[in-house]
């Protein structure tokens, strides 16, 4: 992070750390200078490689990006989730980004860590937390709850042990 947000580490959910370019080179398969914009994740890499190698019957939590890369598909997903479970509930453990909005939340109901909501369309440098100590935070409760519901859907799909903590967490 090199000092952004007063931090020098990479294990946080700010854009400088979590929004990184994904570059794939596969001669004779992927056209040079192909650019794809959208929500993708590292978890999709394995499935993409296996797809390009024509390996069938593999298990993966991700989905192949091949149709997106080859422009047979225009939208891979409408949100992305990132999780961090190294230090416990002393920092946000989950991040969900959807439609230019980002929610960061710990996985326990009683963590002292502030919930964080950013409108990346208006605040791309994430300088104003719309939740936390913001006096106007109630105005953003509906948006935060919508993001949390999408996160809970993802947690359930992935059989996360943190589903209950995230669902019981007070947002405002």
Positions of the model-derived regions?
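Active-site rim elements
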Residues: 9, 29-40, 52-56, 115, ...
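Acidic-residue sensor for enzyme active/binding pockets
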Residues: 15-16, 83, 126
